[in-house]
């Protein structure tokens, strides 16, 4: 160890000690930061699209559909729990509708989550499969669901309702809230809310729409 010659006066001694402590502190901090930022995971962490498998099933299921009969051969009836408004009170009920068969479990999970939510979102009208004579509409293949059309309208670029009346989230219990249970339950599973379309469609949720 090298000898350190301290000056006799107290001021010099204090300065030397401070320098030694400062150097030791910087060395310790450097070691800590090096350990923090030099960490490397043992293996690559995969982060796949959680909806990829289901999207592929849907794609395979509808690729050969060209007629109403073919579309309806791929549908199933589902029954889900819902809330209704009766005499100003929310009561539990069930709703039955048709949906593409490979989406049935997904749809059941969505409505069970909505039903268990604090919001207790009430459903007055629900449309699942509906033959529109065109495959531009996902309703024709059972890939879309509309909720309470009157209170969740489709509007043009000027905000004028094309279908339905008015959207009043927060004041009208049938209107879908952007940050509510309904939107969260659908979008977390890869469904797209029509409010994000250029022609906003607040009632509409479609699976794997681009």
Label for each model-derived stretch:
Residues 136, 141-210:
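Catalytic cores and adjacent binding grooves of peptidoglycan-active enzymes
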Residues 58-126:
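Active-site acidic/histidine clusters and adjacent loop/turn architecture
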Residues 61-69, 133-136, 177-178:
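Intrinsically disordered, low-complexity boundary segments flanking structured domains
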Residues 33-64:
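Structured beta-strand-rich cores of soluble
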Residues 109-146, 151-154:
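Active-site-adjacent loop/helix surface patches within enzyme catalytic domains
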Residues 27-29:
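Boundary at the C-terminal end of the N-terminal hydrophobic targeting segment
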Residues 15-24:
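Bacterial N-terminal signal peptides
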Residues 4-14:
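Bacterial N-terminal signal peptides that target proteins for export
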